[in-house]
Each structure stands twice: as C-alpha cells, then as structure tokens.
Amino acid sequence: MSEGPVKFEKNTVISVFGASGDLAKKKTFPALFGLFREGYLDPSTKIFGYARSKLSMEEDLKSRVLPHLKKPHGEADDSKVEQFFKMVSYISGNYDTDEGFDELRTQIEKFEKSANVDVPHRLFYLALPPSVFLTVAKQIKSRVYAENGITRVIVEKPFGHDLASARELQKNLGPLFKEEELYRIDHYLGKELVKNLLVLRFGNQFLNASWNRDNIQSVQISFKERFGTEGRGGYFDSIGIIRDVMQNHLLQIMTLLTMERPVSFDPESIRDEKVKVLKAVAPIDTDDVLLGQYGKSEDGSKPAYVDDDTVDKDSKCVTFAAMTFNIENERWEGVPIMMRAGKALNESKVEIRLQYKAVASGVFKDIPNNELVIRVQPDAAVYLKFNAKTPGLSNATQVTDLNLTYASRYQDFWIPEAYEVLIRDALLGDHSNFVRDDELDISWGIFTPLLKHIERPDGPTPEIYPYGSRGPKGLKEYMQKHKYVMPEKHPYAWPVTKPEDTKDN
C-alpha cells in the first residue's frame, strides 16, 4: 500500500514570484501570515519574495504587506507579525535572465545547509501575469528545482484564454513538471461553504436522497458584484465576465453540486467524479444565453463600462452573462442549471439556489416551492425555505426557514481564508481542491464554442443595463423560461446572516 503525499513541515522553502504585486500583497503574504499566526506554518519555514521591483525588505515589502495582515487577537498578534517578517527575505531580479534566479538558488541552498536539510522541500507560488508564467516556470526548472528533494508549484489562473491556448500551456509545462507537482489554484475551492458542499450533500441523507431530477426543479449559481471594472477596463476588455468567473469559479461550484459520490475523499477520487460530470455536460446553446454590459446608473452618478478611458467606445465586452447547462445523466437530465454572473449590479453576493418541485395539488392550491439556499459570500449561511402554518386560528401558510448562519453558529471558530486553506493543502500535498489537467481541458471545451460565438466580428451585442440594477431587463423572463418559479406572491423574511448581539442558548 503506497504512502500518502509528503507533508512539508519543518525547514520548508516557499518562494513567492510576483512578490511586489497586488495578489501577493493582498492575498499570498497575508495567507502565509494567517497560517503562521494560527500555528499551521512552522517557524522554521523560510519565505523568499521575488520580483522585478527594486525593493528593500524593511521599508518597501513590509510596508506594502503590513496593512493587509489580519490580527484578530489585537496587540497579542504584534509579536507574531515581527516573527513572521524575520522569516521573509526579498530578492529583486528579472524573470527572463539567470542572475536573479542564481541568487535565489544561492540563498535557498544557504538556508537549507544551515538547517541541515537532507531532502529539500520547495514550494513555488506563481503570483504572476500569464505573459511571464512560462518563462518563470522554465527558470524554476533549470535553476531552483529541488533535484534531490520535492518541488511543488502553485499556479494562479488564468490557465489559458481558450481551449487551444490552455492545451498549448499544458504542452509547454509537460516537460517541466509532473502533474503531481502542479497545483492549479482556484481560490473558490478554498471557500468554507464550497468545501462544505460534499459534506452537505453526502453526509445528510435527507438532502442526498432528494438531490436529483425527481425532486429538484431548477438550480441557480449566482455571482453578483456591486462594483464595475473601476479603472481595470483595459484588462477586463480582453477577458470578459465568462472567463473571469464562470469558466473557473462557478464551474467548479457546479461540479461539486452535481458530481456523484466519490468512493473516498482522497484527492483523485474527488477529481475523477468532477471530470465524469463535466463529460456529461451538453454543449451550451449559443442562442439561449443572456448577455449584458453595464451602462450609466439611472441617476448618472456611476459611469458606463465604455466610459472607462482604457476601453474602446464600441466595445462589446460582456460584463453580465446568464446561461443554462444541461447534464445528460440519470441524476440531472431535464434539470436546468442556470449560471449567471455580472458586475455593477445591485448587490455583491455569491449563492447557490436549488428550487424543489411544487407539491402535488389538492389541499394546497397556491403554495411556494421549497428552496435550499447556500450563501457562499458574504455572510456564509445555509438555509432551507419551507412552508409552515401561520401561528393562530387561521390555517393560512407562510414561508419560513431553517438556517445555519456561520457568523452566529461558529463565533468561536477560526474559519480560514480561501488562500490560507489552499496554501496549507499544497504544503500537505493534498490536490483535492486544485484543478487537474483533464478537468481544465474539459472546462475550456465547454466554454470555448460560446466564447468564439460571442467574440466573432458579427457576434451578438450585449444588452445595456443600468449600473446598480439587477441586470438586463430580460433576466426575469430568462429565469422563468428555465423553470425558476418567482416567489413574488409570497412574502418572506430573509434570515439574519450576521452575528446578533446575544448568542443562542
């Protein structure tokens, strides 16, 4: 029986490429500190930041990162901050020349020698734009790869621009790293409620038994952002909302929602089932997609997407999209799975909504459908909307809920941030929450025909919707077309998803 993956614990070397960038400043270094603060990153770990910017460690890198470090224990965490920065060194170097990487190798080997490391454990985090990713990967392999140890490489999205570019990237990476050395990170897989999906589904018989076409009428996966591109239009214009969040984040949620029970919770069993369900996804109907682009707010205070100076005034970039997936297998055939995502909407949230079929007619002439709602962010919660008799002498019914609100139920728990979870998983050698090469290939195969349809010269023109609205006017009709029953007739008090002043007894 083979042993599990090697855990990186004492005297691990972590190198963060792109250390001067926003991702490293706001996510990578704060995640490393969070793990250290909570005792999940050994103090013997050595962290190297590497970037082209000529920064000093004390005045520049530290001052950039410090405002983003969370200190839940107040002043008690100040000493942890100082200890953490003593673990960090910074190296300035180009990505396409050897000198900087030679210096990094020298510093790594010096540390490992002083720590009497026999089998090097090296984790490389590529917080880099796609344009330099392959260049750095080649330098890692030729200059700092642990030939007599274990190397792991965390890769940030985007993993390609379409199916052809993703395959080209995989082709170029193949000679450099084994699949088990690569950790393609999608941070949504580290979010607490996304990680909880398999337990909710398969650890509760009443949910597991009803999670199928016999009981569920429709499924929605929604991503809403209150803000627009805010000066990033030039970058977003070549990406669009589909590549930004749907081909990756939301599709990952969909696979966990719809996959079959794995034979075990080991990484490959989970990823095998994700691949199986992706293979059952029917091609997207390009004529059954709702596309939008935000215009000015109705009061004129917020600009339109094309008002961004970095965006072409004739841009047809999609900032809102809604589409429906059909999974051709025994569990899901006939159940529309709607995915929608947009910027500059009326609120910011990510949620999953499973609407159950209506009860048989008879004593109940007009009663709402049950819904299971999983709020990923903000204010993580799970609640089941169901019908109950209104208190009193009447036999009237009302919609109420059973709800699990994380902020009140788990007040005394440390709930790690997504990047903390995933970096920890990489250190442990756990691939469960990372994207495998065949999974990536199939996901691009699903979306690339739609992207080509949208981006051809005579492609569809997105519907303009006001900044701060719910999205294109056709959204309600689109949802109803795909079997979602609007609950407009039935008043409902949404559960409180923020901690209250008093704890439950």
From Swiss-Prot:
NADP(+) 1 binds at G18, A19, S20, G21, D22, L23, A24, K25, R52, K157. It comes from the Eukaryota. It is an enzyme of class 1 (oxidoreductase). InterPro entries: G6P_DH, G6P_DH_AS, G6P_DH_C, G6P_DH_NAD-bd, NAD(P)-bd_dom_sf. Disruption phenotype: Shows growth defects in acetate-supplemented medium; the phenotype is enhanced by addition of hydrogen peroxide (increased oxidative stress) and/or double knockout of ZWF1 and YHM2. Decreases the cytosolic NADPH/NADP(+) ratio; this effect is enhanced in the presence of hydrogen peroxide. Ribitol-5P absent from cell. Decreases cellular levels of ribose-5P and ribulose-5P. Decreases cytosolic levels of citrate and oxoglutarate in the presence of hydrogen peroxide. Double knockouts of ZWF1 and YHM2 show an increased mitochondrial NADPH/NADP(+) ratio in the presence of hydrogen peroxide. The active site is at H249. It catalyses: D-glucose 6-phosphate + NADP(+) = 6-phospho-D-glucono-1,5-lactone + NADPH + H(+). NADP(+) 2 binds at R340, K349, R353, R375, Y383, L384, K385, R470. GO terms for cellular component: cytoplasm; cytosol. PROSITE patterns: G6P_DEHYDROGENASE (PS00069). Keywords: Acetylation, Carbohydrate metabolism, Glucose metabolism, NADP, Oxidoreductase, Phosphoprotein. D-glucose 6-phosphate binds at K157, H187, Y188, L189, G190, K191, E225, D244, K343, Q377. Pathway: Carbohydrate degradation; pentose phosphate pathway; D-ribulose 5-phosphate from D-glucose 6-phosphate (oxidative stage): step 1/3. The modification Phosphotyrosine is found at Y145. One of its GO terms (biological process) is response to hydrogen peroxide. The modification Phosphoserine is found at S142. The modification N-acetylserine is found at S2. Its EC number is 1.1.1.49. Belongs to the glucose-6-phosphate dehydrogenase family. Catalyzes the rate-limiting step of the oxidative pentose-phosphate pathway, which represents a route for the dissimilation of carbohydrates besides glycolysis. The main function of this enzyme is to provide reducing power (NADPH) and pentose phosphates for fatty acid and nucleic acid synthesis. Present with 15000 molecules/cell in log phase SD medium. This is Glucose-6-phosphate 1-dehydrogenase. It comes from Saccharomyces cerevisiae (strain ATCC 204508 / S288c). The lineage of its organism: Eukaryota, Fungi, Dikarya, Ascomycota, Saccharomycotina. The gene is ZWF1.
